[in-house]
């Protein structure tokens, strides 16, 4: 659009973001303040959307890109952590080894796109049998698992950015940290095109420069 190239980026921008509001909302609101002429149409979902068929301009997802029709840029990394409330650990004890989780209430996340449970990234002894953890609760949104864990009802495996505040205030405690082997990456994906409109370009650049920069500054405080 000619008007877009001659002035501030404008127009409707359709984006899909995962259900990680505490991570993305500060950057998203800052983008809206910086580019008020860009109209955001936001879909919050953990499902694997078809970027092109569903008409999205940009989506944010984890993992490695698999669609050759899409371009991508990494946003930053995160780690999964096992957390529980002090009250829960006082009542049930602190697990010292991964195998001890079999005697605990375990709160699991189910991937909406596949229906599979998200594996807990526990490093066990070579040759050890795969742990069959109790499924005290299964939920397709991590936010609910955070609430249940904070209420003292079990141990949850959640991204570090979701539990950082609760850990800092003592509402949650990390367990089995030395047995966790995980690093995930968030990426922005958009349809491959010779022409990248200004509204898409500024959104990508803004999120790359802001999203995990905010997170790193919080870690340093």
What are these regions (language model features)?
Residues 1-14:
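Short helix-loop hinge/linker segments at domain boundaries
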Residues 11-71, 220-221:
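Central regulatory/effector-binding core of bacterial HTH transcription factors
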Residues 37, 160-165, 169, 179-221:
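C-terminal effector-binding regulatory domain of bacterial HTH transcription factors
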Residues 40-44, 108, 130-141:
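Short beta-strand-to-loop elements that line the ligand-binding cleft
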Residues 58-61, 154-158:
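Paired acidic/hydrophobic, glycine-rich loop segments that form the ligand-binding mouth/hinge
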Residues 69-111, 125:
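Flexible hinge/capping segments at coil-to-helix
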Residues 72-75, 169-181:
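Short beta-strand->loop
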Residues 101, 147-152, 167, 188:
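Hydrophobic residues within well-ordered alpha-helices
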């Amino acid at each position: 659009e000619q008007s877009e190239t001659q002035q501030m980026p404008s127009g409707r921008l359709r984006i899909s973001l995962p259900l990680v509001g505490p991570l993305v909302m500060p950057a998203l609101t800052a983008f809206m303040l910086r580019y008020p002429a860009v109209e955001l149409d936001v879909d919050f979902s953990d499902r694997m959307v078809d970027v092109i068929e569903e008409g999205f301009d940009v989506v944010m997802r984890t993992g490695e890109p698999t669609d050759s029709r899409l371009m991508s840029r990494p946003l930053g990394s995160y780690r999964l952590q096992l957390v529980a409330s002090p009250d829960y650990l006082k009542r049930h004890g602190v697990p010292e080894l991964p195998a001890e989780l079999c005697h605990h209430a375990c709160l699991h996340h189910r991937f909406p796109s596949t229906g599979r449970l998200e594996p807990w990234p526990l490093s066990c002894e070579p040759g050890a049998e795969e742990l069959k953890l109790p499924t005290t609760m299964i939920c397709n949104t991590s936010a609910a698992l955070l609430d249940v864990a904070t209420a003292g009802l079990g141990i949850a495996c959640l991204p570090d950015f979701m539990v950082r505040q609760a850990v800092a205030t003592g509402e949650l405690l990390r367990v089995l940290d030395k047995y966790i082997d995980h690093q995930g990456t968030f990426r922005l994906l958009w349809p491959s095109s010779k022409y990248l409109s200004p509204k898409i370009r500024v959104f990508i650049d803004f999120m790359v420069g802001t999203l995990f920069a905010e997170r790193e500054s919080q870690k340093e405080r």
